[in-house]
Amino acid sequence: MNDTEFHQLVDAQMQLIEESIDDSGADIDYEVTGNVMTLEFEDRSQIIINRQEPMHEIWLASKSGGFHFKLVDNKWTCSKTGMELIAMVKEECEKHAGETIDWA
């Protein structure tokens, strides 16, 4: 994968995260600045998701720690847990929000 393909794939994941948050109706604010997406919760806690172009990875930082995701079989997969990125984002959002979120 070249850098252009990497950015296109990450853009698609970021869009999926935004749409999932919007569709859920959860009280989560998000902002994208450059290569960084910040999710902010009612208690002001944050989840930071950023693209690491040199390694072709997506990194996620939350209350639970830091996680690195690589594209494996067309899925962004965590090197620590084996979870897919979108599943971990949803799980971490629920931890930060302190409640179950209806992801529809």
UniProtKB/Swiss-Prot annotation:
GO-annotated cellular components: cytosol
CDD domains: Frataxin
Keyword Plastid: no
GO biological process, one term: iron-sulfur cluster assembly
Keyword Protein biosynthesis: no
Family the entry assigns: Belongs to the frataxin family.
Chain's role: Involved in iron-sulfur (Fe-S) cluster assembly. May act as a regulator of Fe-S biogenesis.
Protein name: Iron-sulfur cluster assembly protein CyaY
Source organism (scientific name): Vibrio campbellii (strain ATCC BAA-1116)
Lineage: Bacteria, Pseudomonadati, Pseudomonadota, Gammaproteobacteria, Vibrionales
